[in-house]
Amino acid sequence: MVKKISYIFFSILVFLDKVLKILTKRSFLIWFKDFIQEKSYKSINILDKEIKFFVPNQLLEWRVKTCLTKEPETLQWIDSFEKKENLIFWDIGANIGLYSIYNSLKNINSTTIAFEPSSSNLRILTRNISINNLEKNIKVVPIPLTNKE
């Protein structure tokens, strides 16, 4: 029964997609995905630049909203880095990229290496880097760092 209902629902979506492609030249499924995800993005001002973050849940939305006030000592530490071209910043446990993105904006000529082993965080991290066009500044390494073999 569930298979039949799923198939009927899928068939209706495919039909709507075809009709709307003819009428509007745009896929209904892509439009619907964009519509649903539109509220999943939050913008904040970091160093006089509007930076977007993908925040698919309330916890991540809170993290983005409080990133400039929650751990001011971390931001002060990044601010204290000597300005030089060969600066390499390791963000160990990069999560969704708050500090990786902050460093790449603050220290424009630096290279940021974001270590993040969690696949769900990795998906969000790479999206946040991409939507802010920081792929050249931030390299993602999808493994954990440890002192154990």
Place the predicted regions along the sequence by residue.
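S-adenosyl-L-methionine
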Residues: 1-128, 132-133, 137
